[in-house]
């Protein structure tokens, strides 16, 4: 296959991906806080420059724009998600990354999907933040190569302004990604200094941008209210940092961060087994203590993934008791440590250590701030999930670079395309029904308002488990915001029902 044909196929697969994601994004309804951002409430927040609301200035501006145009929203969602897939492929430098990324993103846990992707307000913070962060990771990823391009170690003035701007953008969207980017900025400078004995001006500029952005974000008066527990919604470590961290971990983090990633975890486990089997064939060390450590790590991960699968199937809609939560939370720690140990040992053996270590630290660092704040939702874990996908693909790169696997690549690609295609059609069916019902109910309400009725029934949407805050209930704050967004008189009462009474 010549270069032109490869480029044509590359453009074709991304064009198809873009088209399907655009169609899907178009069907996503505006829900929950979207109704506030897209109404006068959003403009009021803008007029005060979000004072005492949040320091997510870039994220706030994005959601203000996206809640005013479904076309703009659909284009932004499509561009960001396609961009994430493209940037992951740039990091891995293999075309198979495209197919793995699509399959694993389609298998995103439902709770994360509805809060971080389907919900426009969630997308504006959590998808955009990791998209912009990946841009900088792509820019610096070469520093972890075994034999880096020495030409890249030169001082470059030209990109400095753009890097300062990128650093500021990455620290003005969502808080945990803000802190991650500050750590990323200084860590890159220190790593390059110790490994290459240089300090590159472009890295310093990015770090300076993150410092400026972080200072500006946390200068918002809302963070003083949060830190003093005077905010009515958000708080920091009320009962002490350790007790808050334990509460957050066992209540939310272990499930949303790791355990609920069923498909991703099983995929990583399969790749680990492929690596281990080939390692045993190649190395005499596989029979010594190191080999036993690797086998033990695999055993723990296998038991954990099996438990996670059974827990998801059997207890997915059941409130778990304290004992089970403690067992699962503790098992998650054991499985996570086992995965890191296994990956780092294999990375050392197959000369991929620094990239694996960087991604592993990134996954941990991205979630670390969530231990200290309250509340945290499923949407907070989308950036971590994307980094987990990168981690999985780095493990795949160990396989691709070091082993001869007797599997037809075309078959693997067809399997991935089939899974991705079925997944997209599944979601298109789900959200086409949601889109139709959403437009029908607003038309119904407007007809009733035109007829002079003051008490109107509002029908629940189908498949509400895929949507965040889909239907306003009478007396809730969402009822007021829904009416503002759709220009329904405030003296009209909306009563949510599953079936119209007449």
Task: Indicate where each model-derived feature is located.
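Transmembrane alpha-helix segments characteristic
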Residues: 99-108, 207, 285-310, 348-371
């Amino acid at each position: 296959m010549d270069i032109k044909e490869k480029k044509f196929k590359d453009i074709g697969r991304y064009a198809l991906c873009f088209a399907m994601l655009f169609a899907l994004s178009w069907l996503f309804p505006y829900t929950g806080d979207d109704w506030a951002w897209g109404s006068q409430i959003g403009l009021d927040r803008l007029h005060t420059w979000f004072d005492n609301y949040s320091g997510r200035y870039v994220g706030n501006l994005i959601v203000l724009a996206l809640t005013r145009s479904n076309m703009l929203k659909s284009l932004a969602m499509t561009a960001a998600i396609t961009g994430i897939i493209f940037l992951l492929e740039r990091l891995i430098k293999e075309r198979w990354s495209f197919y793995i990324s699509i399959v694993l993103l389609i298998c995103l846990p439902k709770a994360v999907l509805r809060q971080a992707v389907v919900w426009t307000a969630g997308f504006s913070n959590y998808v955009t933040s990791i998209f912009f962060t990946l841009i900088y990771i792509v820019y610096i990823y070469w520093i972890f190569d075994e034999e880096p391009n020495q030409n890249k170690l030169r001082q470059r003035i030209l990109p400095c302004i753009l890097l300062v701007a990128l650093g500021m953008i990455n620290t003005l969207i969502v808080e945990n990604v803000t802190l991650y980017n500050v750590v990323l900025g200084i860590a890159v400078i220190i790593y390059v200094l110790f490994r290459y004995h240089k300090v590159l001006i472009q890295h310093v500029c990015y770090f300076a941008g993150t410092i400026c952005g972080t200072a500006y974000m946390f200068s918002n008066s809302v963070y003083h209210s949060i830190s003093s527990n005077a905010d009515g919604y958000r708080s920091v470590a009320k009962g002490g940092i350790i007790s808050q961290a334990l509460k957050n971990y066992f209540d939310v983090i272990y499930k949303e961060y790791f355990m609920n990633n069923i498909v991703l975890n099983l995929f990583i486990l399969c790749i680990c087994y492929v690596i281990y089997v080939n390692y045993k064939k190649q190395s005499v060390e596989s029979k010594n203590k190191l080999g036993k450590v690797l086998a033990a790590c695999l055993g723990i991960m296998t038991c954990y993934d099996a438990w996670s699968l059974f827990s998801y199937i059997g207890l997915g809609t059941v409130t778990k008791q304290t004992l089970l939560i403690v067992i699962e939370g503790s098992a998650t720690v054991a499985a996570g440590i086992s995965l890191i140990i296994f990956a780092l040992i294999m990375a050392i053996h197959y000369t991929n250590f620094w990239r694996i270590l960087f991604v592993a630290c990134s996954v941990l660092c991205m979630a670390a701030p969530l231990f200290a704040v309250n509340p945290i939702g499923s949407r907070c874990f989308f950036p971590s999930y994307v980094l987990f996908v990168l981690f999985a693909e780095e493990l795949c790169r160990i396989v691709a670079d070091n082993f001869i696997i007797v599997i037809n690549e075309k078959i693997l690609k067809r399997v991935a395309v089939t899974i991705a295609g079925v997944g997209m059609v599944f979601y298109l069916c789900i959200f086409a029904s949601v889109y139709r019902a959403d437009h029908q109910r607003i038309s119904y309400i407007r007809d009733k308002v035109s007829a002079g009725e003051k008490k109107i029934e509002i029908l629940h949407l189908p498949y509400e488990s895929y949507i965040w805050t889909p239907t306003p209930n009478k007396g809730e704050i969402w009822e007021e915001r829904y009416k503002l967004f759709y220009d329904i008189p405030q003296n009209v009462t909306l009563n949510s029902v599953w079936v119209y009474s007449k």
